[in-house]
Amino acid sequence: MNYFCERYPKREGLVTYIISGDDHEGWYGQREGVDIGWLMEQTARDKYKRTDLVNLGYMEAFIRLMHADYPDVHTYLLAAHPGGGSAYAISYAPQKYVEALQGGEKPAVILFGHWHKMFDLVIRNVICLGGGCTKDLDTFGRKNKLSYHVGGMIVELWQDSIGAIPRWRGEKKQYFDRGYYNDQWNYTG
């Protein structure tokens, strides 16, 4: 926690919302009963006086999107760190995820983490966004023939008078670095 809180960038006016997953940090929760997201936020607040790191919860968080002009009108964005491996096609895992949602719980938008993919798709009238990642390809990814999409996305959503999101725009920023080659023991790059 200390390493993260000391090194994670802090920018005036920006807040990072955290979803902890069912893998990596989630293993601590399963074995030791530690809620890593909560612990990270508390360490940031108590020890480092940081209020820019906010824990949304474990694996999923429904975020209410309020209409600016109609206070009683809203819809939901689901921030999800779903787990599971990358599929043969980028669209497959989000498709199966949306198909598994029960009636009445489909959000307007799902922002997916975990798969290290950047995408925008519409599946069953749900806008599905893969936010990319900040981790360059490593030996695990190369060995398993995975593709990591290093980068991120700025998304604008337009909400109509009944709360639906009929229009959106995503600006993707992709980075190409040589970390796989340069951060390994074999300097072939």
Task: Map each language-model feature to its residues.
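A short C-terminal boundary segment appended to hydrolase-like catalytic domains
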Residues: 159-189
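Core catalytic region of metal-dependent phosphoesterases/phosphodiesterases
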Residues: 1-55
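Residues that act as N-cap/strand-start positions at coil-to-secondary-structure junctions
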Residues: 57-59, 149
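Alpha-helix termini
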Residues: 45-50, 67-71, 98-102
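Short, structured patches in soluble enzyme cores that scaffold and shape functional sites
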Residues: 20, 67, 79-83
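Short acidic-hydrophobic surface loop/beta-edge motif
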Residues: 59-71, 121-123
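Conserved beta-sheet core of the metallophosphoesterase superfamily
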Residues: 74-78, 83-170
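General small-molecule cofactor/ligand-binding pocket signal
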Residues: 54-57, 64, 78-80, 129
